[in-house]
From Swiss-Prot:
Residues that hold Mg(2+) 1 according to the record: D251, E268
Cofactor(s) for this UniProt protein: Mg(2+); Mn(2+)
Species assigned in the record: Beijerinckia indica subsp. indica (strain ATCC 9039 / DSM 1715 / NCIMB 8712)
Co-factor binding details: Binds 2 magnesium or manganese ions per subunit.
Protein name per Swiss-Prot or TrEMBL: D-alanine--D-alanine ligase
Length: 307
């Protein structure tokens, strides 16, 4: 009898639309692998709905708040439904950028200089010498992110808007020039490294991430062998330091510009990497010889409680 997999998707976060795309792609692939699949658009009644549905496995295709921060993981633990990806603690730590920085720094993972402040304070003065980056503490997909350039006299005033939806605390980090890199961990192995270039020379924002043709992916990244291996080593080190399970994807900046510092810096660890047709994790898996169907099947087989 085929396993019944509930694909959790949509949800209540700013990343809802991305999650719907991830969930639809995963559901289609799981059906192709012979699973019985129910697509579940997550709302505040999700506990009651899952208790009634009683799937064998919950495939977590959620992104952002309530799906990536330990909350849905806690619900699934209470219901004793095995689930994919990381557990409660790792999800909560990775989602909170300030807490993740503390854990990574303690593990010897290189991170950018940064400080956490109130968003209104960040709008009043330059917290760090420009260039720097302002990020909400608990959002993904580049929502609410600003790059403050050296020629900007004032910080972004969007931070003062009454309809600001990304929390009152923000992380201010030094901007690291150079190349954008990412590496996926699947199970206990760090796979190949991608260099990401936004089309038009801009930064890797929401449009570059999710619009088809919005970015160029160079796989494998053209790096010196020691740098390439260090990216893989640090990806696995970050994955383990946070206690991640299943899959994760770690983003880096590598400043190899002629005038640069040579730094290789971890930006963040994603415990719920995108699973859309333009997403990086499926691309890395495919390069390793793992089809999208094989990837989602492996994730279902890896599912458990107490993660």
């Amino acid at each position: 009898m085929a396993k019944h997999v509930a694909v959790l998707m949509g949800g209540l976060s700013a990343e809802r639309e991305v999650s719907l795309c991830s969930g639809a792609a995963c559901a289609e692939a799981l059906r192709g692998e012979g699973f019985e699949v129910t697509e579940v658009d997550v709302d505040r009644q999700i506990g009651e709905r899952l208790a009634a549905l009683r799937p064998d496995v919950a495939f977590n295709a959620l992104h952002g708040r309530f799906g990536e921060d330990g909350i849905i993981q806690g619900v699934l633990e209470m219901l004793a439904i095995p689930y994919t990806h990381s557990g409660v603690l790792a999800s909560a730590l990775a989602m909170r950028k300030d807490r993740a920085r503390d854990v990574l720094a303690a593990a010897g993972v290189p991170i950018a200089k940064g400080v956490t402040v109130d968003r209104l304070e960040a709008a009043q003065r330059h917290i760090l010498p420009p260039p720097y980056v302002i990020k909400p503490l608990g959002e993904g997909s580049s929502f609410g992110v600003f790059i403050v350039r050296e020629d900007q006299a004032y910080p972004p005033q969007e931070l003062t808007r009454s309809d600001w939806a990304f929390g009152n605390r923000v992380l201010v980090e030094s901007y690291i020039g150079g190349r954008e890199l990412t590496c996926a961990v699947i199970g206990e192995k760090a796979h190949d490294v991608i260099e990401i270039k936004a089309v038009g020379g801009g930064w890797y924002d929401y449009d570059a991430k999710y619009r088809k043709g919005g970015s160029i992916h160079i796989l494998p990244a053209e790096l010196k062998r020691n740098i390439y291996q260090n990216v893989q080593l640090l990806s696995l080190k970050a994955h383990k330091a946070l206690g991640c399970r299943g899959v994760s994807r770690t983003d880096f900046r590598y400043d190899d510009r002629p005038e640069g510092t040579g730094e290789l810096i971890v930006l963040e660890v994603n415990t719920q990497p995108g699973m859309t047709e333009t997403s990086l994790l499926p691309e890395i898996a495919a390069y390793a010889g793992l089809s999208f169907g094989e990837l989602v099947r492996w994730m279902v087989d890896d599912a458990s409680c107490d993660r």
